[in-house]
């Protein structure tokens, strides 16, 4: 009995000979690439990575991220209030920063402005 690798190599060699008889120039280079992929490298099981049926995959366990303490609704409400307060403060600060440049030109002149103004 021949192994699967030898059978695959024989099939590819037969296809190469058949295409050479037909005069295909491009096809042999493609089959050489395929034979490289199908031939399998060292340490691989025969048959390559082609599997039939379902593949078992490990399901990640995220239980370590879930806190196991009892959450009180009052605490959640306090967290929401604190978060909303922080957002309002951030909005206020950004508004002040944006208006600072605008308000610099809108300030009224001081009373003694004309005493020190060099422009007549």
UniProtKB/Swiss-Prot annotation:
Region entry Disordered, spans: 1-54
Positions with biased composition (Low complexity): 8-27
GO molecular function: alpha-tubulin binding; histone deacetylase binding; metal ion binding; molecular function inhibitor activity
Origin: domain of life: Eukaryota
Region span, Interaction with SIRT2: 31-90
Pfam families assigned to the protein according to its UniProt record, in alphabetical order: BEX (PF04538)
List of residues binding Zn(2+): 117
GO annotation (BP), single: chromosome segregation
Subcellular location: Cytoplasm, Cytoskeleton, Spindle pole; Nucleus; Cytoplasm
Free-text description of this protein's post-translational modifications in UniProt: Ubiquitinated and degraded by the proteasome.
Tissue: Very high expression in heart, skeletal muscle, liver, and kidney. The levels of expression are uniform throughout the brain.
Alphabetic keyword roster: Cytoplasm, Cytoskeleton, Metal-binding, Nucleus, Ubl conjugation, Zinc
A Gene Ontology cellular-component term: cytoplasm
Main localization, broad class: cytoplasm
Family note: Belongs to the BEX family.
Identification of the protein by name: Protein BEX4
């Amino acid at each position: 009995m021949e192994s699967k690798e030898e059978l695959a190599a024989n099939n590819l060699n037969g296809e190469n000979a058949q295409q050479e008889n037909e005069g295909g120039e491009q096809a042999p280079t493609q089959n050489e690439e395929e034979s490289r992929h199908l031939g399998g490298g060292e340490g691989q099981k025969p048959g390559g990575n082609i599997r039939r049926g379902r593949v078992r995959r490990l399901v990640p366990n995220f239980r370590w991220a879930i806190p196991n303490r009892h959450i009180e609704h009052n605490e959640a409400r306090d967290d929401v209030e604190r978060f909303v307060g922080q957002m309002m403060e951030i909005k206020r600060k950004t508004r002040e920063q944006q208006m600072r440049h605008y308000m610099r030109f809108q300030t009224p002149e001081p009373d003694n402005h004309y005493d020190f103004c060099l422009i007549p």
